């Protein structure tokens, strides 16, 4: 087995193994986060802009409890606590959101520029204000290039997100906010995180799709609230615990590599 495959397998096993301890020690925090995450759906339109903050706070409650447990921090009541770690994690999530928004804005400009360049090169006299002109310009060979750029942009966006994935673990471990300074921690581990994430999320996707078909078969296809409850339940009671455990495992191996037999630890 190659080193990369071994790292992926180790990360997946660590994530799955961390589910039961996470539920046992942080169940109250996970439940509180799940309930809080449902509130934005009940907000009136005038204050709908607060939905993102509420969602981040809900995730912070859950992640904070799991990271505190992983790094032997204050436990609270079954993980339920809002302290310095949570404030730092909330700041980290907000900063990561800002970074990702800036990256998306830049990529949006790049995608638009490439699409405009392709359209003008394939259609002399191209009118950028006409939907028909856009459709005609991007229906030929130029459509391949115009379609590859958004795909490459999505890949780049995912890569940036994965490179910042260990920022919360570093923040709790060091006791200070780590965002861009944690970028180097994922050097050489990006593929591991990507593949392990796909493997860990697969059961949730399969279950969600299965429940969706079941709802249609028994005539509950219009019960949107049930679908929301299922998605929130999968997120807070499966994905967040296993993903956090996987990230902690990768973080520990990246910060302090395991020594091979016959060698001294650094």
Predicted features along the sequence, with ranges:
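Alpha-helix capping at helix-to-loop junctions
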Residues: 71-72, 96, 100, 112
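Interfacial aromatic "cap" segments that immediately flank transmembrane helices
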Residues: 2-35, 80-104, 140-146, 159-208, ...
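Membrane-helix interface segments in multi-pass membrane proteins
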Residues: 33-58, 104-157, 205-237
């Amino acid at each position: 087995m190659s080193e990369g495959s071994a790292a992926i397998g180790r990360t997946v096993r660590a994530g799955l193994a961390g589910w039961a301890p996470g539920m046992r020690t942080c169940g109250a925090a996970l439940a509180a986060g799940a309930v809080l995450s449902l509130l934005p759906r009940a907000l009136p339109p005038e204050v709908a802009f607060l939905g993102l903050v509420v969602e981040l706070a809900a995730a912070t409650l859950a992640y904070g409890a799991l990271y505190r447990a992983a790094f032997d921090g204050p436990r609270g009541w079954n993980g339920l606590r809002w302290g310095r770690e949570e404030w730092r994690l909330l700041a980290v999530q907000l900063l990561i959101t800002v970074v990702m928004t800036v990256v998306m804005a830049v990529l949006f400009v790049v995608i638009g520029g490439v699409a405009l360049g392709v359209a003008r090169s394939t259609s002399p006299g191209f009118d950028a204000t006409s939907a028909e002109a856009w459709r005609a310009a991007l229906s030929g060979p130029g459509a391949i290039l115009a379609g590859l750029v958004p795909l490459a942009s999505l890949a780049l966006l995912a890569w940036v997100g994965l490179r910042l994935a260990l920022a919360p673990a570093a923040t709790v471990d060091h006791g200070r906010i780590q965002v861009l300074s944690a970028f180097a921690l994922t050097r050489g581990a990006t593929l591991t995180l990507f593949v392990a994430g796909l493997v860990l999320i697969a059961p949730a996707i399969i279950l969600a799709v299965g429940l969706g078909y079941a709802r249609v078969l028994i005539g509950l296809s219009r019960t949107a609230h049930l679908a929301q409850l299922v998605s929130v339940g999968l997120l807070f009671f499966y994905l967040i615990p296993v993903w956090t455990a996987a990230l902690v495992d990768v973080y520990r191996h990246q910060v302090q590599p395991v020594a091979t037999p016959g060698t001294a630890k650094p």
